[in-house]
Amino acid sequence: MAREDELRDIHEALSGDGSRRTVVLHGLGGIGKTQLAVAYAKRHKDNYSAIFWLNMKDEDSLKQSFAKVAKQILREHPSASRLSSVDMKHLDEVTDAVKAWQGLPYNTRWLMICDNYDNPKLATNKDIAALDITKYLPEAYQGSVLVTTRSSEVEIGHLIHVTKLGDVRDSLKILSNTSYREGLTDGKSSST
């Protein structure tokens, strides 16, 4: 994986004492923020008791994501009693139950990835559909949150500006990995 510096920055910012840590990856659309979040989650999955993915494109997508997270929690942690009693059709209740589970005193090692937070509620954003991410974070100040956004104005944690790849070898490494063509970085590629 290319972007080793960014991966190291994310890891350092999210490593801590059990209190909530938040990293915001911001940059142009298509620059690689989501792929960076995926790479971080894969690389550090053993550091977390659970990893959740929320699509923050709009409120409907977000609430559907919370329903999927609730089902994941019930599969992986069947003793989550509040979640087992929630009607999955009532998405506001599901969201509250997930936030309550995340806020349990012993539950400090989860990672929540908030992807596509591109319409944030800000003083400069007058869109009525804009989302306030803080409404969807647990009230307890614990766990890790990784946000991807196009907005450089989302200031809820450690900001990392994701830019285009500066080193052509990093670009070739990504191309090699995604195309399953070995050796692109050293000039030897198999023609398939």
Predicted regions and their residues:
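Amphipathic alpha-helical "lid/sensor" segments that cap RecA-like P-loop NTPase cores
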Residues: 190-192
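Conserved lysine of the Walker
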Residues: 33
